[in-house]
Regions:
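Intrinsically disordered, low-complexity segments enriched in polar/charged residues with Gly/Pro
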Residues: 1-3, 43-45, 88-89
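Mixed-charge, Lys/Arg-rich low-complexity intrinsically disordered regions
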Residues: 1-13, 18-22, 29-32, 103-106
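Intrinsically disordered, low-complexity boundary segments flanking structured domains
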Residues: 12, 41-46
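Broad hydrophobic/π-residue packing in well-ordered secondary structure
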Residues: 21, 43, 54-55
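Residue-level recognition of conserved beta-strand positions in structured domain cores
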Residues: 25-27, 59
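Charged, low-complexity, helix/coiled-coil-prone segments
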Residues: 27, 35, 74-76
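Short, solvent-exposed secondary-structure boundary/capping segments
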Residues: 32-41
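Intrinsically disordered, low-complexity, charged/polar segments
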Residues: 47-106
């Protein structure tokens, strides 16, 4: 099994290519690592390949905040410089510089 190099990094702010939400990456799976039930719930015509990085996001849209699991092929960098308003931001990240969040060094 070979792993693909991730395009995005922890702390990057990204947006979805097809749906109206954005978020900050807090974890990366270098290939699909969720349930088969979750995977099959995605409509077949938009179901992503499993052999690519998948990202865990603290996500938001105009109405709510939530956590999302998104394939690399469906993400773009978000260069808006707008902060993410997710309530867990301060638990995971210690600050923001430019368009990326960072974790405090131990």
């Amino acid at each position: 099994m070979s792993f693909q190099k991730a395009k995005f990094s922890i702390g990057d702010v990204v947006k979805h290519k097809h749906f109206e939400f954005r978020g900050v990456i807090y974890d990366v799976d270098f290939e699909f690592n969720n349930s088969e039930e979750w995977y099959q719930s995605i409509p077949k015509n938009v179901r992503p390949r499993k052999d690519q990085p998948f990202y865990h996001l603290l996500a938001e849209n105009d109405e709510i905040t939530y956590e999302a699991y998104v394939s690399e092929q469906n993400l773009l960098f978000d260069d808006s410089d707008e902060p993410i308003k997710h309530p867990l931001i301060e638990e995971i990240f210690s600050g923001k510089k430019g368009s990326s969040y960072f974790k405090q060094s131990n």
